[in-house]
Regions:
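Short alpha-helical segments that sit at the start of domains
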Residues: 4-36
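Short, cationic-aromatic polyanion-contact patches
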Residues: 27-31, 80-106
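Short, amphipathic alpha-helical interaction segments positioned at domain boundaries
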Residues: 95-128
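A short, basic/aromatic helix-end/turn motif that makes direct DNA contacts
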Residues: 54-59, 81
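A short, conserved structural fragment
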Residues: 70-83
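Short acidic, hydrophobic short linear motifs in intrinsically disordered regions
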Residues: 43-56
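Terminal interaction helix/tail motif
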Residues: 116-146
Length: 146
C-alpha cells in the first residue's frame, strides 16, 4: 500500500508529532532518541545487534543505549545464539514497546486522546515546560480538524 504525500498532509499526521513524542518520552521515562530508534527497529521487525548499531548512526552517540533499552524491557531476545548453527542472537522490539508505538500512532491519527487525568506527569505543573505542554495538549484535544 502506497501512501501519497498529499494524503499525509490532508490528515495532518505530523501536526502534533512533537507534542505526542514529548508526552510519550516523559510518561514512559525514555529519551527521545531512544523512542525514535525503537520506531525504526519496530519497522525492521527482527534485528541483530549489528542492525541496531547501523540504525543508531543517525542519532547522538550513547554507548549505554543498548543496555538501557534491554534492561528497561524495550528490546527482547527473539532467538538465542547457540554457537554452532546460529552465529548471532536475533532481537525484536518487546510487547511493551509495540504497545507504546501503537498508542502513538493512534494518538497521531486522532483515534485516541492523550490522557488528561491528574496522574499524567504533565498535569503536575512542576515546571514551566509542563504548563506549556498542558496548554498545547488542551489545544490539540479541542482542535476540530484533528
Amino acid at each position: 500500500m502506497k501512501i501519497e504525500a498529499s494524503t499525509i498532509k490532508e490528515i495532518q499526521l505530523f501536526k502534533y508529532y512533537r507534542l505526542i513524542r514529548k508526552w510519550a518520552c516523559k510518561t514512559y521515562d525514555i529519551k527521545e532518541a531512544d523512542l525514535e530508534l525503537l520506531l525504526y527497529l519496530d519497522c525492521e521487525d527482527k534485528f541483530t545487534r549489528d542492525d541496531f548499531i547501523k540504525g543508531m548512526h543517525i542519532y547522538s552517540w550513547d554507548k549505554s543505549r543498548w543496555d538501557r533499552l534491554r534492561k528497561a524491557g524495550w528490546i527482547d531476545v527473539w532467538r538465542q545464539r547457540n554457537r554452532t548453527s546460529r552465529k548471532y542472537t536475533i532481537y525484536k522490539t518487546s510487547f511493551k514497546s509495540k504497545q507504546l508505538i501503537l498508542r502513538i500512532y493512534r494518538i497521531l491519527l486522532g483515534e485516541e486522546d492523550v490522557p488528561s487525568s491528574e496522574r499524567n506527569v504533565f498535569y503536575k505543573n512542576k515546571t514551566y515546560t509542563d504548563k506549556v505542554m498542558n496548554t498545547a495538549m488542551e489545544r490539540m484535544k479541542n482542535d476540530p480538524t484533528r
